[in-house]
Each structure stands twice: as C-alpha cells, then as structure tokens.
A protein has these predicted regions:
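Short coil/turn connectors at secondary-structure junctions
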Residues: 8-10, 32-33, 49-52, 82-85, ...
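Short, structured patches in soluble enzyme cores that scaffold and shape functional sites
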Residues: 58, 91-92, 107-109, 128-130
Length: 204
C-alpha cells in the first residue's frame, strides 16, 4: 500500500514524476487533446475500441495488450507514427488516485516552472504519490513547487538530482526505461494539465 504525502489544504495537485504525471504532461504538450485516467485494464480496452491510444504499466512494466507503456518516450514515438488525439492511461498508483478525484492539477519536473506560476495564489494541496520504491522524487517536486508558490527561487538542479538518484529512477533503468528518466529531467513544457469530471485537459 502506497502512502501519499500531502502538503497544504485545497485543490489537489498530483505529483507522480516517474511517470504518470510526466506521461500526461507530454501527451497534452504534443497534440493529445484529452487524457482519461482509468482504474482497470478492462476499462482501458473499452476506450481502445473508441479510438483511444491506451498506455499503462503495472509495477513499471508495460501491460500486455496495451499500445505503449506508461512512458513519455514511447508516447512521443506513437504520436509521431500515428494520428492519436486521445489517450487512456492506467498506472499502478496515480490513476487510481486521479479516478477518485473530481478535480486536480498534474505536475512533474516537466512543468514545474509553469505550475509555480499558474498556481500561485491558489489554495492547493500538493500530493506526492510515490510508489513501492518510495516517494523521494515526488517529494522533491512538491517541496520545490511549494517554494515557488511562496515566491522563492526553485533550485531545478537540486530537483533533477533527487529524481535521477531516486530508487524509482534506478528501478526504471534496471528494467530498460532509463531513457524516460533522462527525458523527464531534461525537458520542459509550458502546459498545466487539469482533471475535471474524469477528463484531463490543458489548463489555461
């Protein structure tokens, strides 16, 4: 059972750097118009029949029968090769949490700068999702975002080091997803996803 860390009270801000938040952000920054978090494989396959790209993982590894894993690098390749506009996502931890919420913002290292700007002045609850490998990389983003929301300068290099050296990052490298880790800490997008009524779209 994963125990979330929460800082503050207000609209949830979900941080799952490796990798759900990063996959969602990458999708919306690269032509996907909506992302649907799903609870089960069965639900994901229903969306596949409706023309959705389906992405997902269980304990880091791609779910059998899905188009891609929970991988921003695989997602970019799929978008380049196809004409996908909608994505359904199933992950071990984050999508379960997202499915339980009516509203939420989604943040990662990929959009830390824009999130600190757009969420400043709002009442929010910063939630580090974590995994069975811990939540150090998510905690780093939560703490950095909290600083940014309070007007302090964010130390992006410190955040990057926490993510790269986390147990979750080492696990991903060990199962062949090191390119995702490298992408996530070296890319920046100007998009802030928001979940409303089960659908995630870009927030303006």
């Amino acid at each position: 059972m994963v125990k979330y860390f929460k800082l503050g009270e207000g609209l949830p801000v979900i941080v799952d750097v490796l990798r759900a938040s990063s996959t969602i952000i990458t999708a919306l920054a690269n032509g996907i118009i909506e992302v649907i978090p799903v609870k089960s494989k069965k639900e994901a396959f229903k969306f596949k029949k409706q023309g959705y790209l389906i992405a997902g993982e269980q304990y880091g590894r791609k779910i059998e029968g899905f188009d891609i894993g929970n991988s921003p690098v695989e997602l970019l390749r799929a978008i380049k090769e196809g004409s996908w506009k909608k994505l359904a996502l199933k992950t071990t931890n984050a999508t379960k949490l997202l499915c339980s919420l009516s509203e939420a913002y989604i943040v990662s290292t990929l959009n830390l700068e824009v999130a600190s700007r757009k969420l400043r002045g709002k009442e929010v609850s910063l939630i580090a999702v974590g995994s069975r490998h811990g939540l150090e990389e998510d905690m780093a983003v939560v703490l950095a975002l909290n600083k940014g929301l309070n007007g302090a300068r964010i130390n992006y290099q410190w955040v990057k080091e926490r993510v790269v050296n986390s147990r979750a990052a080492k696990h991903l490298r060990s199962i062949g997803y090191g390119s995702d880790v490298d992408f996530i800490v070296n890319t920046s997008y100007d998009v802030l996803p928001k979940l409303e009524k089960g659908i995630i779209k870009g927030y303006n």
